[in-house]
């Protein structure tokens, strides 16, 4: 099969392929970018595979960087663009179900494609637009099926993260998992305990943000993979609560998705749960803030202080999630209340601790912090104007 029109992302990278071929080697576009081109989906990263060994690749191009040369990858700098060029390779026995004990460079495209995870990710595309399809991936693409390359159990034993990737691809593409592939995934889910939490988080996060997240999550639940994820053992019934969200609902952000997950799981200690997933502090705080906003909304409308406390984006994401839960919402009222605030950050207050110490005799400590907070909330509540005259008058009254 030949692409009738080469996507612009590939056209831009063609000079790299052509230079490698002029040097006497093979070179192809590979991986998800080829799949996305065939599906007419947006193309993100353009990856190139070649028969040239890393040192040979570096001799072809004047500007390169070693980013994973032990695995055969050289970063080629072509004008303003950067491309990862990786040597065809085979992999030895995998250690800990996550990484090969050794990588061997080869000259064979077929040997390289054999080690890919799913047939729809095992395409190669040459400079003429010709598709190399050694594992009937085009047929699977047509049937919208996710099938492991070769023997499914071998692929998942090599790298157990591929199990989570299978659920994630199902969520992003909306494809069905081929029965033997899914059977192997279900059998080998205990291997997920060998995968780093960080890698698992990335795949689970992508699953939740995907347009067909319900399909991916349903397969994950059916496989009982959750039993091998941090703090999620025996959580099937609670995970199913996510399916109570509106049918066509998709998450706006990772923070919103994980807030929904914690809501579904009825997690009492969000901080501990997110720590077990090794998320960043900033991410954990935003997820917890969303949960706090949701709890506040359960008790009625948000106050001015509530709107001041949180970023408007989080306030609206919480409202969006409430709507998906089938609850009453009023995003316009929240936006108007937020916009009506005199200040949105205490740094905007027209007085500071230094002035209070110098002009009013306050000493650093709890009393100073207390009066500053009092001024801050008086301004937020609309009881005090945010200008020096008004604040000084307020302070004189306090004295």
Curated annotation (Swiss-Prot):
Family annotation (InterPro entries) = Bact_CCA-adding_enz_type3_sf, CCA-adding_enz_C, CCA-adding_enz_firmicutes, NT_sf, PolA_pol_head_dom, PolyA_RNA-bd
Name the Enzyme Commission number(s) assigned to this protein. Answer: 2.7.7.72
User: What's its catalytic activity?
Assistant: a tRNA precursor + 2 CTP + ATP = a tRNA with a 3' CCA end + 3 diphosphate; a tRNA with a 3' CCA end + 2 CTP + ATP = a tRNA with a 3' CCACCA end + 3 diphosphate
Entry binding sites for CTP:
32, 35, 116, 159, 162, 165, 168
Q: What is an annotated GO biological process for this record, any one? A: RNA repair
The protein's job, in short, is:
Catalyzes the addition and repair of the essential 3'-terminal CCA sequence in tRNAs without using a nucleic acid template. Adds these three nucleotides in the order of C, C, and A to the tRNA nucleotide-73, using CTP and ATP as substrates and producing inorganic pyrophosphate. tRNA 3'-terminal CCA addition is required both for tRNA processing and repair. Also involved in tRNA surveillance by mediating tandem CCA addition to generate a CCACCA at the 3' terminus of unstable tRNAs. While stable tRNAs receive only 3'-terminal CCA, unstable tRNAs are marked with CCACCA and rapidly degraded.
Its UniProt miscellaneous note says:
A single active site specifically recognizes both ATP and CTP and is responsible for their addition.
Q: What is this protein called?
A: CCA-adding enzyme
Q: Write down the species.
A: Streptococcus pneumoniae serotype 19F (strain G54)
Q: What is the lineage of its organism?
A: Bacteria, Bacillati, Bacillota, Bacilli, Lactobacillales
């Amino acid at each position: 099969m030949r692409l009738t029109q080469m996507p612009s992302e590939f056209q831009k990278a063609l000079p790299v392929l052509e230079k490698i071929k002029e040097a006497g080697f093979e070179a192809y576009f590979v991986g998800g970018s080829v799949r996305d081109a065939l599906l007419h989906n947006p193309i993100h990263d353009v990856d190139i595979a070649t028969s040239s060994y890393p040192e040979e690749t570096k001799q072809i191009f004047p500007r390169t960087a070693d980013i994973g040369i032990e695995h055969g990858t050289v970063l080629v700098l072509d004008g303003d663009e950067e491309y990862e060029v990786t040597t065809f390779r085979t992999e030895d026995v995998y250690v800990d179900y996550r990484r090969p004990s050794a990588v061997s460079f080869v000259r064979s495209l077929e040997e390289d494609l054999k080690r890919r995870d799913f047939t729809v990710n095992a395409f190669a595309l040459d400079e003429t637009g010709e598709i190399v399809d050694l594992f009937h991936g085009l047929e699977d693409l047509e049937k919208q099926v996710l099938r492991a390359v070769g023997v499914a159990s071998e692929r998942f034993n090599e790298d157990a993260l591929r199990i989570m990737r299978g659920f994630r691809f199902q969520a992003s593409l909306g494809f069905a998992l081929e029965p033997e592939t899914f059977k192997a995934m279900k059998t080998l889910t205990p291997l997920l305990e060998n995968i780093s939490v960080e890698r698992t988080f990335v795949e689970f996060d992508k699953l939740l943000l995907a347009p067909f997240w319900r399909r991916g999550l349903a397969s994950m639940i059916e496989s009982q993979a959750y039993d091998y994820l941090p703090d999620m053992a025996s959580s099937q019934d609670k995970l199913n609560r996510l399916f109570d969200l509106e049918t066509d609902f998709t998450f706006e952000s990772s923070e919103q998705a994980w807030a929904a997950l914690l809501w579904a799981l009825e997690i009492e200690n969000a901080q501990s749960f997110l720590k077990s997933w090794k998320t960043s502090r900033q991410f954990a705080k935003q997820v917890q803030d969303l949960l706090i906003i949701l709890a506040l909304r359960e008790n009625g409308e948000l106050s001015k202080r509530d709107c001041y406390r949180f970023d408007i984006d989080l306030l609206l994401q919480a409202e969006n999630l409430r709507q998906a839960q089938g609850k009453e919402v009023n995003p316009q009222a929240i936006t108007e209340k937020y916009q009506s605030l005199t200040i949105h950050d205490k740094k905007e207050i027209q007085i500071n601790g230094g002035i209070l110490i110098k002009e009013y005799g306050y000493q650093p400590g709890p009393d100073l912090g207390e009066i500053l907070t009092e001024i801050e909330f008086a301004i937020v509540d609309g009881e005090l104007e945010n200008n020096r005259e008004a604040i000084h008058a307020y302070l004189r009254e306090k004295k």
